[in-house]
C-alpha cells in the first residue's frame, strides 16, 4: 500500500478532535485506501485492533436498505467497554439518515469518527441539521503528480518523461498502479465514469432522457477551461434541434458537481475585489475523464494543463478563481488566507507575443506570479514573473 502523506498528515492533525472527519471525492479516487492507511497508522500508534471498527456500507451490501437506527445499533454492539473507539465508516451515504447515527455516536459514546462518501447524499442538508459545526470536510482528489511518481517507483524514467504519461493517463490510483496502454487505461476510467453517472446521477435523480444528459456532459467536457453558462448550453442544444430548459441544465451541472465529476471555478474581479456570479469555468475531476469520453487529441492539451494546475492548487488548500483584471484574464488567482499567487498556463510561450507575462505584469501588487508551461527552454524570470516548467511547478514546495 502506497502512503498518501498529504491526507495522512491532515487526518493526524484532527485525530481525537471531537469532529466527524468526512473524506469526500469521486469514486475510485482512493478514499477507502486512505481509511486502510489510517487503520494501519492507528495500530502502529498503539491503538488496540478491537477498538478500531471498520465498516463498509456499499449499495451491494445493503441493497435492501439499512436504517440509521440499525447502523447505530450495529456499531454500538461492537463497543464493549468505555475505552475510545475509532470508527472508520466507508461509503456512509448508502445509509439513509447516516448523519443521525453518526451524531448519536459522537454524542453518546467515546468515539473518534471518520467517514467517506462519493456523492451528494453524503453532503445533504441533513448534515446542517445534525452535524452543524461538528464535522470537517476533507476533499480527496485523484493522484497529484508527486503522488503519481511515488506510485511509479522504482520506474527509471525521469519526472518529465513520466509527466507525459500522467498528462495522458490521468491520476486514478488503479491506473497508476498498473502498466496500461492508453486504450486499457481509458477503458478502466470509462468504467469508473459510467458507475458515477449511473449510480450517483441518472438513477438517483431519475433522468429519463439519457441521450440529452450525455450531450450536456459532452458539451462540458469539450469546453473545459472555457467560460460558459447554463444559458449557453441551452442555446447550443437548441441549435442542434434539442430542447432543454436552463433550469434543467442548472440541475445537471449541480448533480455532476455533487458527484465530484466537475468542479466549478468562479471569476474574481481584481479591481472590485469580489467574486463574480457569471461566466464560470468547470474542470474535470481527472484529465482522463475527458479522454475516455472524447479520446485523446493533441489540441486539447492546453485545457488539460489548466485542469491539472487547477487541482494542484486546490490540493494545496487554495481557493481558486479565474482572475478578471479589467479586460484581461488571468488563468488562476489562488488565495489562501492573506496570501495569494497568480498563475498563467500555456503549452509554450508564444515567440511573437508577451500576452501571458504582460497580463501578470499589469497586476500591481507583490504576490508571486507564475507562467507554467511545457516549454523546456522557457524557464527563467521576466520582471519578477517566474517562468516554470509544469513538472517543476507540480513538484515545487515554494507555494
Language model feature labels by segment:
Residues 2-16:
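Pre-Walker A adenine-sensing motif
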Residues 23:
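Hydrophobic anchor at the beta1->P-loop junction of P-loop NTPases
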Residues 31:
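Conserved lysine of the Walker
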Residues 34:
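Hydrophobic positions on the alpha1 helix immediately C-terminal to the Walker A/P-loop
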Residues 53-83:
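Short glycine-rich substrate-engagement loop in P-loop NTPases that contacts/grips substrate
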Residues 118-120, 124-227, 260-263:
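Interdomain motor-coupling "hinge/lid" segment immediately C-terminal to the ATP-binding subdomain
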Residues 180-339:
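Accessory nucleic acid-recognition modules appended to NTPase machines
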Residues 323-324, 347-391:
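Catalytic cores of nucleic-acid endonucleases
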Amino acid at each position: 500500500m502506497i502512503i498518501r502523506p498529504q491526507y495522512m498528515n491532515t487526518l493526524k492533525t484532527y485525530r481525537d478532535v471531537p469532529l466527524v472527519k468526512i473524506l469526500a471525492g469521486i469514486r475510485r479516487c482512493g478514499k477507502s485506501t486512505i481509511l486502510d492507511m489510517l487503520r494501519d497508522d492507528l495500530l502502529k500508534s498503539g491503538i488496540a485492533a478491537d477498538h478500531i471498527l471498520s465498516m463498509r456500507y456499499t449499495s451491494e451490501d445493503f441493497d435492501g436498505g439499512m436504517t440509521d437506527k440499525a447502523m447505530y445499533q450495529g456499531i454500538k454492539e461492537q463497543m464493549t467497554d468505555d475505552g475510545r473507539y475509532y470508527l472508520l465508516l466507508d461509503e456512509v451515504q448508502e445509509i439513509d439518515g447516516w448523519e443521525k447515527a453518526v451524531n448519536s455516536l459522537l454524542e453518546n459514546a467515546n468515539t473518534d469518527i471518520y467517514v467517506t462518501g462519493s456523492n451528494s447524499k453524503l453532503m445533504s442538508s441533513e448534515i446542517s441539521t445534525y452535524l452543524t459545526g461538528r464535522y470537517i470536510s476533507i476533499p480527496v482528489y485523484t493522484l497529484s503528480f508527486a503522488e503519481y511518481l511515488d506510485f511509479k517507483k522504482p520506474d527509471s524514467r525521469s519526472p518529465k518523461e513520466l509527466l507525459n504519461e500522467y498528462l495522458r493517463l490521468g491520476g486514478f490510483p488503479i491506473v497508476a498502479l498498473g502498466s496500461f496502454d492508453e486504450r486499457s487505461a481509458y477503458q478502466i476510467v470509462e468504467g469508473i465514469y459510467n458507475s458515477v453517472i449511473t449510480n450517483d446521477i441518472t438513477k438517483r435523480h431519475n433522468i429519463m432522457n439519457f441521450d440529452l444528459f450525455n450531450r450536456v456532459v459532452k458539451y462540458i467536457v469539450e469546453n473545459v477551461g472555457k467560460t460558459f453558462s447554463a444559458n449557453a448550453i441551452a442555446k447550443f442544444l437548441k441549435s442542434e434541434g434539442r430542447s432543454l430548459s436552463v433550469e434543467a441544465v442548472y440541475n445537471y451541472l449541480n448533480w455532476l458537481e455533487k458527484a465530484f465529476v466537475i468542479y466549478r471555478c468562479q471569476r474574481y474581479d481584481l479591481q472590485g475585489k469580489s467574486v463574480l456570479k457569471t461566466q464560470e469555468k468547470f474542470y474535470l475531476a481527472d484529465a482522463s475523464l475527458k479522454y475516455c469520453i472524447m479520446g485523446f487529441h493533441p489540441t486539447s492539451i492546453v485545457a488539460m494543463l489548466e485542469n491539472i494546475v487547477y487541482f494542484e492548487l486546490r490540493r494545496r488548500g487554495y481557493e481558486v478563481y479565474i482572475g478578471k483584471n479589467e479586460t484581461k484574464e488571468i488563468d488562476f488567482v489562488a488565495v489562501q488566507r492573506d496570501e495569494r499567487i497568480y498563475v498563467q498556463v500555456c503549452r509554450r510561450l508564444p515567440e511573437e507575443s508577451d500576452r501571458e507575462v504582460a497580463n501578470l505584469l499589469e497586476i500591481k501588487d507583490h504576490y508571486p506570479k507564475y507562467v507554467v508551461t511545457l516549454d523546456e527552454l522557457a524557464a527563467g524570470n521576466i520582471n519578477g514573473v517566474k517562468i516554470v516548467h509544469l513538472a517543476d511547478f507540480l513538484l515545487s514546495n515554494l507555494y
